[in-house]
Each structure stands twice: as C-alpha cells, then as structure tokens.
C-alpha cells in the first residue's frame, strides 16, 4: 500500500524529476565532457552527479520520509540497503559511455519499490524524447499511449538484446562472448544499445522480444524498467529461470510465449562451447 501519497502522485513527481534531469542530459550531450573512470571502462561525468542531485532533491522535497538509492552515491560506496520502506532507486544517466561518445541511447531511470517490489517506473530518453512509464496494476505507457510486449512465439524469429558490461577480466569476457555466440544460433539477430533500462523498455514496447544481462551494476539499472515490462504483459526472471531478484545483478525479460524456450537457450548457452 502506498505511503505518503498515491501511486499516481509518485509517478507524476518522478516524471517531473526525470524530465528536468533529461534537460541537463540533452544540453550536455554534444558538449565536451569531464570524465572520471570508475574502473577500466566504467565512466562517470559531471552530468551524472548533477542529474542525481537534481532528482534526489526533487523527490525528497515531496517525499522526505522515503528512502533513496542512487548509482552515483551507492555504487561509489558499495553500500545500499533495500528495505520494505518506499525506496526510490535512481540511475541518473543510464548509458554514460554512450553519453560520453555522443551515441544516442541514454536515459534517466527512476524506480520506486514498496516492500522491495518494483511499483512505479519511469524511464526517459531525452535525446529522442521518449517517456516510458508504469504503475503496478495500471499498465505501461510510451508518451502516454499504452504499450504491450511482442506476441512473437518463435525464438528463431526474435530479436535479442544484451550488454557486455564493464568487467574485462579474461574469465568474464570469455564467458560473455561464449554465451552470445551460442545464443546467436537460436535467434534472428542481436542488439546492444548500451542501456539496460532502455533494453527493458524496448522489450515492453515490442522492439525486442528477448533481453538478458548478467552482472549489471546494481538495482538502479533495472528498478525503472522492471515494472514497465511487467505492466506491458512481459515476464521478468532470473536467467536461470528462477524468480527475479532486483538485487541479484541478473535479469532476463521476454513475453510469456517465449519464456520457456528462452530459459532453455540461456541454460544451454552456459555449457555449450
């Protein structure tokens, strides 16, 4: 049950925050970026920090009793505590590497969990002005129009999305590429857009039939898109086929017709060389 407001109110405030942050992203997209390396290939910019501050300040003004988890604050400390309390989970710039390179797949992702369940989701792509929204039990929308997952039922006719992450040790790279190589024999083609949140939304609106990612950064990568996928009629689960856990850094999404075949293909891809 919502606390300190209705779910519609939560969504409205989150949309406002996402659009304000999106304006910062849009203005900075073609400018010179001041980049800091979080790891070998993981980047953060001044825009990430400015957007997270803006979003949290806006949300805290409206919902001061809520909890807050953000990529730039939580990832930096390696510490976040997801409780049953209403918790806003934010990735201020999902697709920072794209942003740095001027590659137009960048978004703001804002999710609200209540009882650890993704309940409200907002994903805003300011470069092409696409706003994905969802409320648990009330549908998913793209720029105010209802969206649904693809009705495709054949794996071989399906478009698969994934990402390669930012870890570059030999074992991770070998495992990732082996998995992709094996899956390519099962699907029509593969896409990597560089944003987990957008990948999930593209499943929700039918642009992708399949998506999986193993080893993403944290709950901020999926909190916004998770409820949007479910409300669009999709299914969200662990790549092993078990129940999705927002804190596990493992996610897969598709439509109900493809889930069984997709899980089988994912499992086989782990062992076939």
Curated annotation (Swiss-Prot):
UniProt induction comment: Up-regulated by light and down-regulated by Li(+).
Tissues expressed in: Expressed in seedlings, flowers, young and matures green fruits. Detected in roots and stems.
EC number from the UniProt entry: 3.1.3.25
Keywords: Hydrolase, Lithium, Magnesium, Metal-binding
Binding of substrate, residues: 71, 93-96, 194-196, 221
Catalysis performed (reactions): a myo-inositol phosphate + H2O = myo-inositol + phosphate
UniProt: Mg(2+) 1 binding residues: 71, 91, 93
Signal peptide: none
Keyword Metal-binding: yes
GO biological process terms held by the UniProt record: inositol biosynthetic process; inositol metabolic process; phosphatidylinositol phosphate biosynthetic process; signal transduction
Coiled coil keyword on record: no
Superkingdom of source: Eukaryota
SS bond list: none
Residues given in the record as Mg(2+) 2 binding sites: 91, 94, 221
GO molecular function: inositol monophosphate 1-phosphatase activity; inositol monophosphate phosphatase activity; magnesium ion binding
Similarity comment: Belongs to the inositol monophosphatase superfamily.
Protein name, per record: Inositol monophosphatase 1
Provenance organism: Solanum lycopersicum
């Amino acid at each position: 049950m919502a606390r300190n407001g209705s779910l519609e109110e939560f969504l409205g405030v989150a949309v406002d925050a996402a659009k304000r942050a999106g304006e910062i992203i849009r203005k900075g997209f073609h400018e010179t970026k001041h980049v800091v390396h979080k790891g070998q290939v993981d980047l953060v910019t001044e825009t990430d920090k400015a957007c997270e501050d803006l979003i949290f300040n806006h949300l805290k003004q409206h919902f001061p009793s809520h909890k807050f988890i953000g990529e730039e604050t939580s990832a930096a400390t390696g510490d976040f505590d997801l409780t049953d309390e209403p918790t806003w989970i934010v990735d201020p710039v999902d697709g920072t590497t794209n942003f740095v390179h001027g590659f137009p797949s960048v978004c703001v992702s804002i999710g609200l969990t209540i009882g650890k369940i993704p309940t409200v989701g907002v994903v805003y792509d300011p470069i092409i002005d696409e706003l994905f929204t969802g409320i648990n039990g009330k549908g998913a929308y793209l720029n105010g129009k209802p969206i649904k997952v693809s009705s495709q039922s054949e794996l071989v006719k399906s478009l698969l999305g994934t990402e390669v992450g930012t870890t570059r040790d030999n074992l991770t790279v070998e495992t990732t590429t082996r998995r992709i190589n094996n899956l390519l024999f099962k699907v029509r083609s593969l896409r990597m857009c560089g944003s987990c949140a957008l990948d999930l939304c593209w499943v929700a609106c039918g642009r992708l039939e399949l998506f999986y990612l193993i080893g993403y950064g944290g709950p901020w990568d999926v909190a916004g898109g998770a409820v949007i996928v479910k409300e669009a009629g999709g299914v969200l689960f662990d790549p092993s086929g078990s129940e999705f856990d927002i804190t596990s850094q493992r996610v897969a999404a598709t439509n109900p017709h493809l889930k069984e075949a997709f899980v089988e293909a994912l499992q086989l891809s782990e062992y076939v060389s």
